[in-house]
């Protein structure tokens, strides 16, 4: 009597088809993980920037270095040993203002006042006001590896007389 070894051609084709269906079902989920990670990172950064904005406004009010909403000259406060440029009671729109509000961010040597230059910060890049990289030319951060970096960003819109607005853009992540 002859012993059969292995699989028949029909069994092999059935297994390959089943594996193909499973792969086609699971692949979109794995591809979307990068987008989800970028979206979560931008949303987390937006929350951090909003918290820093409120903290700095409270600190400037308490320390007497400027009352939010009151027009004053540029001044400085120190948070965790890092000097921060303040205007009108809020972080200014340059990398040595709102940029240094994020732990671990280091402003370039010589400062960056009136500079829209890109400053890398972890997975993000910070751009000062007038940069053309963040919608409206506002200051902010973006993820350069996103499909549309300008729409995977955190905007810091500084309106000279009121509370700056933090906008999180995730449509391009």
Protein language model annotation of sequence segments:
Residues 1-34, 41:
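N-terminal single-pass transmembrane signal-anchor helix
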Residues 2-5, 29, 38, 85, ...:
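Arginine residue identity/basic-tract feature
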Residues 15-17, 49, 55, 164:
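Short, contiguous, well-ordered secondary-structure segments
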Residues 37-64:
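Membrane-proximal N-terminal amphipathic helix
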Residues 62-173:
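Periplasmic/extracellular, small/polar-rich flexible segments of pilin-like filament-forming proteins
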């Amino acid at each position: 009597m002859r012993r059969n070894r292995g699989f028949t051609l029909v069994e092999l084709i059935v297994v390959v088809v089943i594996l193909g269906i499973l792969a086609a079902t699971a692949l979109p989920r794995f591809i979307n993980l990068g987008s989800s990670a970028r979206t979560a990172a931008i949303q987390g950064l937006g929350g951090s920037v909003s918290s820093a904005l409120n903290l700095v406004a409270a600190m400037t009010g308490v320390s007497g270095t400027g009352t939010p909403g009151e027009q004053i000259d540029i001044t400085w406060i120190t948070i965790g040993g890092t000097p921060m440029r303040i205007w009108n009671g809020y972080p200014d729109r340059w990398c040595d203002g709102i940029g240094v509000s994020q732990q671990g961010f280091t402003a370039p040597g010589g400062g960056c006042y009136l500079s829209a230059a890109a400053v890398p910060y972890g997975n993000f890049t910070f751009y000062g006001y007038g940069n053309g990289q963040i919608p409206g030319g506002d200051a902010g951060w973006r993820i350069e590896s996103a499909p549309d970096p300008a729409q995977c960003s955190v905007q810091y819109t500084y309106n000279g007389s009121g509370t700056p607005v933090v906008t999180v853009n995730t449509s391009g992540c």
